[in-house]
Amino acid sequence: MPRRREVPKRVILPDPKYNDKTVAKLINILMVGGKKSVAESILYRALDIVESKSGEEAVKALKKCLDNIKPALEVKSRRVGGSTYQVPVEVRPDRRVSLAMRWLIKYSAARSEKTMTEKMAGEILDAFNSRGAAVKKREDTHKMAEANRAFAHYRW
């Protein structure tokens, strides 16, 4: 824990197209090398594809997709008496969103479609329907936490 003052959270302005902070945050995480316009075009085109395929509003579909990816529990390493235990802990709300967005982008990039737009749209649709690699990552994280439930009393 830092002993100095707490650093204030930066205010993120909503994105211009959907006027939504979640979309703006996802664009910022998707951005590589400061190329925001590229990240915006990838995400906006992906959301257009999602809207046409799912029939649901793009932002609503994205938020439902992120809700399906957000982990409730995770494991953290804790060293006790010479051995390291994987201790299950609850995930803070802001970290849940952050992890969900990172996993969405990571597993989108790993897909086999041609362009990042198609990959992103495919992963959003899969997560929207509670399947896909990002949702599997969440399930695996929960399984790890459940398997190490015996060490829950080591929480700090």
Swiss-Prot record:
GO terms for molecular function: rRNA binding; structural constituent of ribosome; tRNA binding. SUPFAM superfamilies: Ribosomal protein S7 (SSF47973). Keywords: Ribonucleoprotein, Ribosomal protein, RNA-binding, rRNA-binding, tRNA-binding. One of its GO terms (cellular component) is small ribosomal subunit. GO terms for biological process: translation. The keyword Isomerase does not apply. PROSITE patterns: RIBOSOMAL_S7 (PS00052). One of the primary rRNA binding proteins, it binds directly to 16S rRNA where it nucleates assembly of the head domain of the 30S subunit. Is located at the subunit interface close to the decoding center, probably blocks exit of the E-site tRNA. PANTHER family: RIBOSOMAL PROTEIN S7 (PTHR11205). Part of the 30S ribosomal subunit. Contacts proteins S9 and S11. This is Small ribosomal subunit protein uS7. It comes from Trichlorobacter lovleyi (strain ATCC BAA-1151 / DSM 17278 / SZ).
